[in-house]
């Protein structure tokens, strides 16, 4: 990692040593291990508003927000109250509950094209189930996905995935057989002409196109104007379904997610959506949903099987309902403004130190590519950055009490709890971090190593 000298964190270091003895790599999701930036991961013991506190008693301004879910900030009173009330009533029943009906109704109300929705436990389950449903509905097998887009760790979608696969520099992953990905076509993101060419050749075999509504697992790479609408058009022409992965963008970009800022305005809709993160309020909850005729193929109404013992868990549902109900227009305005503030502070500091970088955003999701490129529109562009400079920047900010994603290929997040005091702390820390990044010798571009949905 060049000139990076991670600071000491004795309690976290001891916890990490213990974890490595009993947990593969010492963590339960790869990007948390700090492999992309070096040093020892911080073991957090509490969160409050925009802050995290680690096992050594140090407090950090949190710009990860649990990889997106904590849009209200940590330990928001309404969420804590709802979860406490739910726990006191029992943790799981294995039956339908009133809360899951209310959460489904709220999702359907907020995202117009979603006529019916099924609750699950993770984004991976949601995308896996949506792909199975698309195949069952169309009677076709082929799926188109885009390099650098991450749709969970389901085998068929791990080909050229972003997030953790990118963070660790893995081309793919052992254990995923050729048979598992034989029906997956991976294309460059934002290249509509190539998608059209593949449809022209194989359109009658393609069940669905799955895409992140705005890519945020190779760093943040928004869709080029017309790209998502073009996918909709091609799917219509060839009888395929369009699946919008809004696990990261859903209910964070707006009340109706990325679709609310694009498709709703342009008058087009995906056939299926996947959701997660914000909709669970920090607890394990996700969903997939869409057109009623497509969802009608799902068991027990139809023949496409999907199930889950803990799906619709009452505690997760309570957290999700409380979070979504608290996400008012004022909350979204605050989050949007704070994202602009942080991006501006960091970009100014890097510019003043002559560090080549490219800020990139999709709504309130943002990241920085350490590159002199004028634009990054796909995975290849995201990979061609100087990630060692990010590592130096990361550790300087960490030492100053600012917690960033431990990978150059992950999105940054803010919450409605981030206030002027947090902006002042970030502004105070950024110049030294920019100097640390500038001190790293200009390397040859290195392959990306993104995280994975934390």
Curated annotation (Swiss-Prot):
GO terms for biological process: protoporphyrinogen IX biosynthetic process. The keyword Cytoplasm applies. Its main location: cytoplasm. Its cofactor is pyridoxal 5'-phosphate. It is found in: Cytoplasm. Its EC number is 5.4.3.8. It catalyses: (S)-4-amino-5-oxopentanoate = 5-aminolevulinate. It comes from Frankia alni (strain DSM 45986 / CECT 9034 / ACN14a). InterPro entries: 4pyrrol_synth_GluAld_NH2Trfase, Aminotrans_3, Aminotrans_3_PPA_site, PyrdxlP-dep_Trfase, PyrdxlP-dep_Trfase_major, PyrdxlP-dep_Trfase_small. Belongs to the class-III pyridoxal-phosphate-dependent aminotransferase family. HemL subfamily. GO terms for molecular function: glutamate-1-semialdehyde 2,1-aminomutase activity; pyridoxal phosphate binding; transaminase activity. Transmembrane segments: none annotated. One of its GO terms (cellular component) is cytoplasm. The modification N6-(pyridoxal phosphate)lysine is found at residue 277. This is Glutamate-1-semialdehyde 2,1-aminomutase. It comes from the Bacteria. Keywords: Cytoplasm, Isomerase, Porphyrin biosynthesis, Pyridoxal phosphate. Pathway: Porphyrin-containing compound metabolism; protoporphyrin-IX biosynthesis; 5-aminolevulinate from L-glutamyl-tRNA(Glu): step 2/2. Homodimer.
């Amino acid at each position: 990692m060049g000139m990076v000298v991670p600071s000491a964190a004795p309690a976290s270091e001891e916890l990490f040593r213990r974890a490595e003895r009993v947990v593969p790599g010492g963590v339960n999701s790869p990007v948390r291990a700090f492999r992309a930036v070096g040093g020892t991961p911080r073991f957090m013991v509490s969160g409050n508003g925009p802050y995290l506190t680690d096992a050594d008693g140090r407090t950090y301004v949190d710009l990860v927000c649990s990889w997106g879910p904590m849009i209200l900030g940590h330990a928001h009173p309404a969420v804590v109250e709802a979860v406490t009330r739910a726990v006191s009533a029992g943790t799981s029943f294995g039956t339908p509950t009133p809360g899951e009906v209310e959460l489904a109704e709220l999702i359907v109300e907020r995202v117009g094209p979603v006529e019916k929705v099924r609750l699950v436990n993770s984004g991976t389950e949601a995308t896996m189930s949506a792909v199975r449903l698309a195949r069952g509905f169309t009677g076709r097998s082929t799926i188109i996905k885009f390099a650098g887009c991450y749709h969970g760790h389901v085998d068929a979608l791990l080909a050229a995935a972003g997030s953790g696969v990118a963070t660790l520099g893995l081309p793919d992953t052992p254990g995923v057989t050729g048979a598992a990905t034989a029906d997956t076509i991976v294309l460059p993101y934002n290249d509509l002409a190539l998608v059209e060419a593949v449809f022209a050749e194989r359109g009658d075999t393609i069940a669905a196109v799955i895409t992140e509504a705005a890519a945020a697992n190779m760093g943040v790479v928004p869709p080029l104007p017309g790209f998502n609408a073009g996918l909709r058009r091609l799917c219509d022409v060839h009888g395929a379904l369009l699946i919008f992965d809004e696990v990261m963008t859903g209910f964070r970009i707006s009340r109706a997610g990325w679709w609310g800022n694009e498709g709703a305005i342009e008058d087009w809709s995906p056939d299926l959506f996947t959701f997660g993160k914000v909709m669970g309020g920090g607890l394990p909850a996700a969903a997939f949903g869409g057109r009623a005729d497509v969802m009608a193929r799902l068991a027990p109404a139809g023949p496409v099987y999907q199930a889950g013992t803990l799906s619709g868990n009452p505690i997760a549902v309570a957290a999700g309902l409380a979070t979504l109900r608290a996400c008012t227009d004022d909350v979204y305005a605050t989050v949007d403004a704070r994202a602009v503030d942080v991006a501006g502070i960091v970009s100014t500091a890097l510019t003043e130190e002559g560090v080549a970088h490219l800020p990139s955003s999709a709504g309130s999701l943002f990241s920085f590519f350490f590159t002199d490129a004028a634009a990054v529109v796909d995975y290849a562009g995201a990979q061609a950055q100087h990630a060692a400079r990010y590592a130096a920047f990361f550790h300087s900010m960490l030492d100053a009490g600012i917690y960033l994603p431990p990978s150059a290929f992950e999105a940054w997040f803010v919450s409605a709890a981030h206030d002027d005091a947090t902006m002042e702390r970030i502004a105070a820390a950024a110049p030294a971090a920019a100097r640390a990044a500038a001190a790293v010798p200009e390397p040859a571009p290195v392959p990306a190593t993104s995280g994975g949905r934390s």
